[in-house]
């Protein structure tokens, strides 16, 4: 996927990426994005994948979507190692702000678990909805400036409607913060604050909805 973006957006469309080579720019956006999307996808399907266990054994059901984050974190660790190798190949050293990158990672997991938990409960009641989830995640990717800057090619601001969508999207601030922390760029603290607020709300809503319908899982499954 990164090769496709690099070829068409980096070489053909020549999407501006600021001071970073496009390959590094897009990879530092896709690494945290795949952490998010993999966690959401796994959590969303976790209850249906564990239906036999849920119907026979009682345990806190919320543990099921939360446990789905484990493999995603392993993949993230491997991808981060590849990212470090790519930075070394480009002669780019991480900034001192690298130590702040885990803050963005933690908030990404907060958002992902909130969304994934909500979708997991929804999938139990509406099983066909699981086939819609990948398309929603794909649409969310293109609403997030992970593979492009949040400006047009001329540097002018994007239309107001687009900017509002990006501002309300918690992944916008989190990916921007992750990238800035990695390369020692100016840290977008305001965007991080908005992302933390929206992410915390999504996590709360996801858990509340899950707990409200949790008692019906064994009957439905």
Give residue ranges: language-model regions.
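Transmembrane helix-loop-helix hairpins at lipid-water interfaces of multipass membrane proteins
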Residues: 1-22, 163, 176, 180-183
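Alpha-helical transmembrane segments and their short interhelical loops
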Residues: 3-16, 61, 66-136, 185-210
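Long, hydrophobic alpha-helical segments
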Residues: 25-38
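Transmembrane helix boundary and interhelical loop/hinge segments in multi-pass membrane proteins
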Residues: 36-62, 66-73
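A cytosolic-side transmembrane-helix exit/cap motif
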Residues: 42-48, 118-125, 151-155
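Faces of alpha-helical transmembrane segments in polytopic inner-membrane proteins
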Residues: 75, 138-145
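Short cytosolic juxtamembrane segments of multi-pass membrane proteins
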Residues: 128, 211-221
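Short hydrophobic, aromatic-rich alpha-helical segments embedded in or entering the lipid bilayer
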Residues: 142-193
């Amino acid at each position: 996927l990164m090769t496709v973006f690099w070829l068409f957006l980096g070489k053909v469309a020549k999407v501006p990426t600021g001071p970073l080579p496009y390959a590094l720019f897009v990879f530092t956006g896709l690494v945290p994005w795949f952490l998010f999307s993999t966690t959401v996808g796994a959590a969303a399907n976790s209850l249906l994948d564990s239906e036999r266990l849920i119907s026979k054994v009682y345990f806190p059901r919320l543990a099921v979507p939360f446990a789905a984050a484990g493999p995603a974190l392993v993949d993230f660790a491997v991808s981060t190692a590849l990212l470090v190798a790519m930075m070394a190949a480009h002669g780019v050293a991480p900034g001192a702000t690298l130590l702040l990158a885990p803050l963005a990672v933690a908030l990404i997991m907060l958002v992902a678990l909130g969304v994934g938990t909500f979708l997991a409960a929804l999938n139990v009641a509406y099983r066909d909805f699981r086939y819609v989830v990948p398309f929603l995640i794909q649409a969310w990717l293109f609403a997030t400036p992970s593979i492009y800057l949040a400006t047009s090619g001329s540097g002018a601001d994007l239309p107001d409607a687009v900017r509002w969508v990006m501002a309300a999207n918690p992944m916008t601030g989190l990916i921007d913060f992750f990238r800035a922390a990695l390369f020692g760029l100016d840290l977008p603290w305001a965007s991080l604050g908005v992302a933390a607020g929206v992410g915390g709300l999504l996590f709360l809503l996801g858990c509340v909805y899950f707990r409200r319908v949790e008692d019906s899982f064994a009957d439905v499954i």
